[in-house]
Structures are given as structure tokens and as C-alpha cells.
Amino acid sequence: GEITPSCSRFPTPSGIFRDAIGLSKLIPSIFKPGIIMADWDHKESKFVDQVMGAFMFMRKSIFEKIGYFDEQFFVYYEEVDFSKRLSEIGGKSFFDAEIKAIHTREGTTSSVKAFRLFLNLQSRLKYAKKHFKSSGYWCVWFCTFFIEPLTRSVSLLFSDKKNEIPDLFKGYWLLLKNR
């Protein structure tokens, strides 16, 4: 197997904006990724904002104190929200580089790319509404509906994934229909 970036920074409106326009991919020497910690090799253990929910351990007492996972987040952002609430009570997430786990990336949703995109974007908007001020939420909303469709389309056009363009449009159509 290979090491997959599995830790993230807490989302912020500016981080989402930077990722939406692709600054970390265009100028990685200046702009680090806004959310996914792809700029770190994950070879050493350290405290991070958030670890991927596919493989987390915690004391039951902490889980109960925070209030479990928020059910409004389905498949995506549930661990981000949980970790954010953990940090708000002074808790921390720790990434242990010695622990190995096998995770089939997109295993649940690999055959439904449009639906996966819809769920991810929908959960991100719910996270923004829950954790950001109104201006931050509307910044994320604008990025989601106006900037990202364009940058994602251009990125797919200039890649070997042109066949995913219909899924991109279908995912955004689902988001528009279900907002």
C-alpha cells in the first residue's frame, strides 16, 4: 500500500476558497492546501486538527461528552464536525504514524461519482452553516456554486479524466435540486 494523506486542517472560508481556485496546486511553494494536509508526508506522529473518520479511536467518555456524530452529515464532514467540537472543549486529535490501516478510498461511493460529489458539497455547506459566521458561509456558498464548477471543469478538461465531466455536472445538478 501507500500512505494517503488522511489528516486535515479545519476548513475555513479562506482555505476553501484557496482550494476552490487551485492555488495550492498552481503555486505549491507559496500556498499550502487549505484543508487536506497533502503538503505533509504523514511519516511522523503529531497533533493535527482532524484525522480521517475511517479509522479513529477515542475514549467513550469523550465521545459521549461531545455528543456523538451529528446526523446531518452523511458520509462526509461528520468527522470534521466531530473534531471541531472536540477542539472547542480543549481536546486534540493525534495522528499516530506507527498505526497502519487499509482503507479502500471511495469504496462506498466509487461507482456513484456524481452522488459522491453531491454529498461532499452538501456536507461542506452544512458544515459552513454550522461553524462559520454568515459572511463565511456565503463565501463558501459562492465558491461552491460559481468558482468550483468552473475550476473543476477546466481541471478535468486538461486531464485524463475527461470522462468524469458528466458526473461533475450531474453532481452539481443534484446539489442545485436539493438545496
Cite the ranges covered by each PLM segment.
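Nucleotide-sugar-dependent glycosyltransferase catalytic core
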Residues: F74, S83, K100-S123
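A short, mixed-charge helix-start or loop-turn motif at secondary-structure junctions
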Residues: D41-E44, E106-S110, F132
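Residues that scaffold the ATP/ADP-binding catalytic core of kinase and kinase-like folds
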Residues: S6, A20, K65-I66, Y76, ...
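Compositionally biased, charge-rich terminal segments
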Residues: G1-P13, S110-S111, R116-C143
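Non-catalytic, C-terminal membrane-associated alpha-helical segments of glycosyltransferases
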Residues: F115-S123, S134-R179
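Acidic/His-rich active-site region of diverse nucleotide-sugar glycosyltransferases
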Residues: E2-I66
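A short, conserved alpha-helix in the catalytic core of glycosyltransferases
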Residues: W40-K100
